[in-house]
Amino acid sequence: RYDGTNLFGVDPKYKFNPMWSISGAWSINRERFLRDARWLDNLRLRVSYGAQGNIDRTTSPYILGTWNSTSLGGASEDRIDVTSPPNQNLRWETTYSWNTALDFAAFEHRLGFTFELYGRRSKDLITTRTIPSETGFISTSSNYGEISSKGIEFTLNTVNIRTRDFRWETSINIAHNTDKVEKVRIDDNSWSPSLQGYSSGAVFAIKTAGLDENGIPMFWRDGEKISLQEFVGFRVEASDPWGLGIPEYFEYGPAMNVSQKDVRSYLTYAGSRNPDVTGGFNNRFYYKNFDLAISCNFVLGQLMTRSPFYNPAQTNPGQNYTTEMNKVWSPSNTSGTYPSLTGNLQADGSAWGDWDENPDPYRVYYWIMDNFPTNVNLFNSLDIWNQKA
């Protein structure tokens, strides 16, 4: 298969990209040495390898702009704001993937499993890179990024009970997947660290060192505990009562002596939003014209980012809060683990952030009943959900 697009550069070699795959299977149970294994229903080894392309429709080889207006001499004039410079060298993103699997079934398909190994590597991913400002732009898109992933998955299916009127089936699935950003560029003015060498779901956070005697956060820097204001190295502004150093609150000018590079160095790897292990199991019961399904899903080794349950600079006595507010530091609760309150009015400013934590396995239970007899007219299917985190 040979696909082409006019969304890339003018050079014909960038317009087309071959898509191909090759696969094969070996039905081992049909071999002569297993001919007498009557109990074996299926034993098959599968392998595949191939390449496929992807088009990033957010980019273009042509100059892009948005229609706008401006004031010139007191009169409104139309203008075009250039949002993307022309780039004639963009090409397809390409992904190479391989897969190996073993299928097994026995005892009239009452017991079966699939064991699978897979890997993927995507190249020429379109990323943003910094270019000299003399060009009139500060960044452009280029085929530079690269990411890889690999994993293992196991699925077990059983028929536990099978009679004339009743059948009980179980399916269990568990998978482990890892991914890694092999190549990526970041702008010099980026506040976030590079993902290169980390998972695509990597989370970076500032490592805290508890609270001081006034309930204000402290941080680690170069192995030492330092105050929040000293940590970011500039004066506390009214719009940033703790001196948190949140980028949008930075006071540009002589008061600021912290750079984007400094901020990136403060951030440490906290974990990944991509779970290490996922899985679940499903039980399905059939009795005459009724069937009932009970399922559970889980994830392990995942970091979650959640918004704080309160804003220390914007609290309201008339607002409902969770019981976690009892853990907020105050002069009467010096054992509190959450930062103290610094304001109670909207005008006091804002000091929001994200909290990173390792959650309990996420479980979703649900029951499904359907295939009711035709003389039951109330409903044809009943779904009952119970979700717990």
State the predicted function of each range:
Residues 1-205, 379, 383-389:
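Extracellular/periplasmic, surface-exposed regions of secreted and cell-surface proteins
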Residues 3, 101, 263-266, 278-281, ...:
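Short, hydrophobic/aromatic alpha-helical segments in well-folded domains
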Residues 39, 344-389:
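Membrane-interface anchoring segments and C-terminal beta-barrel signals
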Residues 53, 121, 178-182, 212, ...:
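Short loop/turn segments at secondary-structure transitions that flank enzyme active sites
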Residues 80-81, 258-264, 372-379:
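Short glycine/proline-rich turn/loop motifs
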Residues 142, 159-271, 304, 308-315, ...:
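Conserved small-residue
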Residues 169, 272-300, 373, 377-389:
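Conserved C-terminal beta-signal and adjacent last beta-strands/turns
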